[in-house]
């Protein structure tokens, strides 16, 4: 796999701090050093290559706003599913994973990773086919959360769900019909939340594997939410049910 370019101050900073392999950092000419002091300091401590370049070079490297900073890094590695399951056996508290069935928008995946990190979700599972991969755009949208949330890429989602069930997980599918209000769902057990694709929802095989279905009430004129918005509401509902007000653990 080829190295990839990431852009933006948050994404680059988190890549450095997390220990990701970084081959080069580009800084825009004329940028105020105090705006990127943390990046420069961390890069110096790790003896990383830093080059000052014209804005035009960063514009050519990036397909998104770059804030005057970019980096060439090693490809993102996917977490191993079996190792992840083992790690969850040793953790305190109840495990939560999010399964994305056919999500193809990189901005949605990045946003979901950002909320997953913020709400304490333990991991995200995506299929190898019909799904966006971990790309520069995903990294930018996640504002660095891509470095902290394990993402597992599996061949067969239905089989993976069976394995999750064997390890005690209950599987909740986001579904509009014949579903429980997400505010009434149980969260006192290891939980896997399935979010379907933006256009088609969950595939039939995956849908049939769910233990129960949850929905978000819609009282306006539109009948659906963006996948990342729906996922965020559900992730934080799990957090709300498991933590008292003032408990930031």
Swiss-Prot record:
One of its GO terms (molecular function) is RNA binding. S-adenosyl-L-methionine binds at residues 196, 216, 225. The keyword Transferase applies. GO terms for cellular component: cytosol. InterPro entries: Alpha/beta_knot_MTases, Ribosomal_eL30-like_sf, rRNA_MeTrfase_TrmH, SpoU_MeTrfase, SpoU_subst-bd, tRNA_m1G_MTases_N. Pfam families: SpoU_methylase, SpoU_sub_bind. Its EC number is 2.1.1.-. The keyword Transferase applies. GO terms for biological process: methylation; RNA processing. Keywords: Methyltransferase, Transferase. PANTHER family: 23S RRNA (GUANOSINE-2'-O-)-METHYLTRANSFERASE RLMB. Belongs to the class IV-like SAM-binding methyltransferase superfamily. RNA methyltransferase TrmH family. This is Putative TrmH family tRNA/rRNA methyltransferase. It comes from Staphylococcus haemolyticus (strain JCSC1435).
């Amino acid at each position: 796999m080829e190295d990839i370019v990431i852009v933006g101050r948050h994404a680059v900073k988190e890549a450095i701090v997390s220990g990701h392999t970084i081959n080069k950092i580009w800084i825009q000419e004329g940028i105020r050093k105090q705006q990127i002091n943390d990046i420069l300091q961390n890069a110096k401590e790790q003896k990383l290559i830093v080059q000052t370049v014209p804005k035009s070079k960063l514009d050519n490297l990036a397909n998104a706003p770059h804030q005057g900073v970019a980096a060439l890094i090693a490809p993102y590695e996917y977490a191993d599913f079996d190792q992840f399951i083992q790690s969850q056996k040793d953790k305190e508290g109840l495990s939560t994973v999010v399964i994305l069935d056919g999500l193809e928008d990189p901005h949605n995946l990045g946003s979901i990773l950002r909320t997953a990190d913020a709400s304490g979700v333990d991991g995200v599972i995506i299929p190898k086919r019909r799904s966006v991969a971990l790309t520069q755009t995903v990294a930018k949208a996640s504002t660095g959360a891509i470095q902290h949330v394990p993402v597992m890429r599996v061949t067969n989602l239905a089989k993976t769900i069976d394995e999750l069930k064997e390890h005690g997980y209950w599987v909740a599918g986001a579904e509009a019909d014949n579903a429980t209000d997400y505010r009434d769902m149980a969260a006192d057990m290891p939980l896997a939340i399935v979010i379907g694709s933006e256009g088609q929802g969950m595939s039939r095989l995956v849908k049939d594997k769910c233990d129960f279905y949850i929905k978000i009430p819609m009282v306006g004129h539109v009948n659906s939410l963006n996948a990342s918005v729906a996922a965020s509401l559900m992730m934080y509902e799990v957090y709300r049910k498991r933590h008292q007000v003032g408990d930031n653990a």
